[in-house]
Amino acid sequence: EVQKNLEYYIVNGFGSSMYRGLMLDSLKGRSVSRKSGSNQAAGREAMVIILQMIDSLSDEAKETMLSTMKYWMEQNPGFVDGLEGVENLAIKKRAREILEDSSIVAAVEPLHKSFQYMDRAVNRLDDYLFAVSMYSERTQNTEIMNDENRMGWHQNNGMTYIYDSDQDQYTDNFWNTVNPLRLPGTTVVPVNIGTGTPDSSGYAQGGDYCSNESWVGGSTIGNYGISGMSFSGAS
């Protein structure tokens, strides 16, 4: 059971939540506001974990992740060189073995994935990935905490992301410069919701809330899917 869960998290979790070695911002919560928490940095952390675990997977799962890792590393060539320090020697060696193994085909399969417990959807083809962030009575419009992501009010109001060959699009100060009231894909009244008054932590941590709506999610058939969100905004 533990083995099955491990493989599910790696293959269906990490394998569905990254693009060319980048962790999708739609899945990162308030960490999008951290300079140290870019999709490049988060993706590197995930790839290190996968390399540590890859030889513990079953043959089928291992074959899938070897192909995926080789593809990500080829598309993100700075990853291996960035593995510095004694603690990364074995990981760097394994990464180079994968890259130099001609029997491993670098590939990532197309997919459409609905993360029903997170109210997210991902559609991935060879040359792009499209993601949608939603929220419902189960999830919040954003995550505001510890003085982080203070203007994230509309991040899950149907915000859309398109990842393509520009790997710096969401890494190069995107969240510092984008208009938080006019996020891509959203149709909202551009209101500064604020963060309320400070609580016992000393931080004002309001501005995030669940929706009153339950009709949020999608259906998937193979690599095709459809998503929808009943949206009522703040109340």
Please place each PLM-identified region on the residue numbering.
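Alpha-helix boundary/N-cap detector
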Residues: 37-41, 45, 60, 64, ...
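Generic structural signal for hydrophobic core residues of well-folded globular domains
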Residues: 50-57, 72
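Conserved aromatic-histidine-acidic binding/catalytic patches
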Residues: 34-38, 57, 121
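Aromatic-lined, polymer-binding surfaces characteristic
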Residues: 1-52
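Catalytic and substrate-binding regions of extracellular carbohydrate-active enzymes
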Residues: 64-235
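Structural helix-adjacent loops and short alpha-helical linkers that scaffold large soluble proteins
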Residues: 2-4, 54-67, 97
